[in-house]
Amino acid sequence: ETVQTGEQTKEATGEDIAEERRVVEQLSKLYNWQIKLINLFLEGESTPEIFMEIYSDYESRIKALNEKRLEMIARYESRMKELTQRLETLKLRHEVSEISQREYIRQKIEIDNELGKLKPKLAVLQNPIEIKIGDIPKFREDVLKLIDDVKAKGPQLKLPQDFVERVVGNLNALLDAMQDLVRQYERIRTEILKLEVRYKVGELAHEEYLTQKRRLERQLELTF
């Protein structure tokens, strides 16, 4: 079975995340092509030489884009940490009456606005395969199966052992890059399960239960 990424899941939404979306869209396409290439090779549709040449091309392009993605993530996380610390300092300065209520509100709005712009940028970058949150378990399962297939069939198809290990290493790195998405999926699923229990014990009315459940299920349809 061919593993598919969710590269067409969601169109770019607004100029604020345009650059981040471009990076992730390119990465998603390359991952998709690379995974399809692996499957074609395992099905006997390519010689080892052609496979290794094209795979290496995708690999180098993915590496360059991933370096850019990780640099952007580090920059945004650093800035968000700085802004959060500024908020805490601002709150303390206001509590001891060093600054007025008006000045506190003005600065807080300014900081909140910047944080509000950085959070969606970071969320986009943390999904390099542009896959729906709800599709994460199936995608992860398919990648794990692909790893097993490469280990088993690669040597049989005359792929050098060092290249087999290289492909497996890259697939494992992709799984590692998905850890934030896995945690998001598990958090949402846990919230849905808790909601069902609250409904069953009578804490929530049927309509309220359905409203909250639909809200959580919509989150599983998002790519960030």
Predicted regions located by residue number:
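Acidic, Ser/Pro/Thr-rich low-complexity regulatory regions
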Residues: 1-224
